[in-house]
Amino acid sequence: MVTIDNSMTATQLNDLPQTAQLRKNAQPELGLVCITFDKKVRFRTMTRTRYLKLSLAQRESSLREIYLHNLQCLHDALTFCQENNLRLYRISSALFPLSDMEDQIGSNILEEISTDLGKIGERSQALNIRMVLHPDQYVVLSSDSPEIVQTSIKILERHARTFDLLGLPRSPWSLMNIHGGKSQRSEQLIKVISNLPENIKSRLTLENDEYAYSTEEIFNVCQKAQIPMVFDAHHQICHENLDSYDHPSVAAMFYAARETWTNPEWQLVHISNGEQAFNDRKHSNLITNMPNIYRQAPWIEVEAKHKEVAIAHLRSWWLMGQ
């Protein structure tokens, strides 16, 4: 049973970005996920299968072209966020594809453009835009296969290196968010997390999902592993088959998740709506239903198909009502 402590106070904020310190009594910050609906922000990628068919010279030229394009696209994404007053941006997990291949071609290209990457990171801080990441579904730290666990760690190492090259802090301010993975493997999950490299663990967060782990289970893992929990209200109602975002357990788990954040002002949550029905796991185009408790959320990633259009719509009917 989860114990809710509503008397919890915020920790000292001296080491936080100045903008984070100024959030008291502010409206929630709504975040853009990876790309824009109007195609202004679109990243390029390459599959492993196609890559392996290329010669070494072709691999290098192809990856260099993709990386430089995506670097410019990341710059454009920050510009878009600035122009649309968005202070939260989720970076694409495919920003620099295949940079962890054994031939080290992608890795070497990243080193070559490291100065430009650092400038992007500096720009995000100058614009007061928080950048976060959600690695793909292949990250399964709770797997009973040692090979899958090692592959998962390798993926996280790739993303952590990108964040380091961007100069982003090794803290949940620049979080890398994953799901629990294989069900009924909580102890394995805790064990693997405890042994992760510092540049991964210092940024790692866990999110409740709609299939394998209940919100309470992920909360308990986060407490034991001493990492923050990203609460997803839609996953909660899907997993528990609830009929309202304002079910008491939604607010209870929102507050429980807040307990896992050393700095509650950094707490980040997700929102999506069902496409065809309230409990539909597929994301809708817009957000037309919000948990009342989310008015107390500092940071909200908007997971809707129409991206910035959904954010503008949400601002018009929800934030304006605060």
UniProtKB/Swiss-Prot annotation:
This is UV DNA damage endonuclease. InterPro entries: UvdE, UvdE_bac, Xyl_isomerase-like_sf. Its EC number is 3.-.-.-. Component in a DNA repair pathway. Removal of UV LIGHT damaged nucleotides. Recognizes pyrimidine dimers and cleave a phosphodiester bond immediately 5' to the lesion. Keywords: DNA damage, DNA excision, DNA repair, Endonuclease, Hydrolase, Nuclease. The keyword Amino-acid biosynthesis does not apply. Belongs to the uve1/UvsE family. NCBIfam families: PRK02308.1-4, uvde. GO terms for biological process: nucleotide-excision repair; pyrimidine dimer repair; response to UV. It comes from Nostoc sp. (strain PCC 7120 / SAG 25.82 / UTEX 2576). Signal peptide: none annotated.
